[in-house]
Swiss-Prot record:
Its cofactor is Mg(2+). Belongs to the eukaryotic NMN adenylyltransferase family. Divalent metal cations. Mg(2+) confers the highest activity. It comes from Mus musculus (Mouse). It holds the Pfam family CTP_transf_like. This is Nicotinamide/nicotinic acid mononucleotide adenylyltransferase 3. It comes from the Eukaryota. It is an enzyme of class 2 (transferase). GO terms for molecular function: ATP binding; nicotinamide-nucleotide adenylyltransferase activity; nicotinate-nucleotide adenylyltransferase activity; protein folding chaperone.
Amino acid sequence: MKNRIPVVLLACGSFNPITNMHLRLFEVARDHLHQTGRYQVIEGIISPVNDSYGKKDLVASHHRVAMARLALQTSDWIRVDPWESEQAQWMETVKVLRHHHRELLRSSAQMDGPDPSKTPSASAALPELKLLCGADVLKTFQTPNLWKDTHIQEIVEKFGLVCVSRSGHDPERYISDSPILQQFQHNIHLAREPVLNEISATYVRKALGQGQSVKYLLPEAVITYIRDQGLYINDGSWKGKGKTG
């Protein structure tokens, strides 16, 4: 892994609730970047959206952060960061990226320290921060008034994207349809999930509301938390469903 560029992957979203598909995005993206021979993924960050995002059926951020922490108990490289969810208001994605980039700079400066014996080349390379998303997010860049062009350009030019394809999406076309994405496509990495994976948080919420099993769609610890906290449940639908959902 010598001379590879270190990378931190950041995923923003509702995580309402976090699913196994969210975790797979990180694994697929890491494999793809490693296979290029140029990058070494050193960390993954999950950033649940602020409560003021106003999305329908969005449970409180402290629950979503707690569920993400439980889901990541078995991961040695992905963590949840509550900063975005703890802000006074909803934060645009580019502002979340800026925050974590500043944190990387601060962390790197502290690690290097004022050591006069170190030459610049001897210092560890500053990790690149890249936004991790599904192809559905790439498609939303074309939605009128949803993203500012200046923000899209900053994301793809300064940071970069790692986009994991999902069935029913054509990321290459989304890029070719956007002058900004086309200009900076060298900084957009398209990874393909070889396993058909159609788990969505929307489906999970619907299944929970109808008292259906979500076992194997979510980490077991998350299912237990949802049951114990009574989240996404209508009319006591967990009754008679057993402890594992």
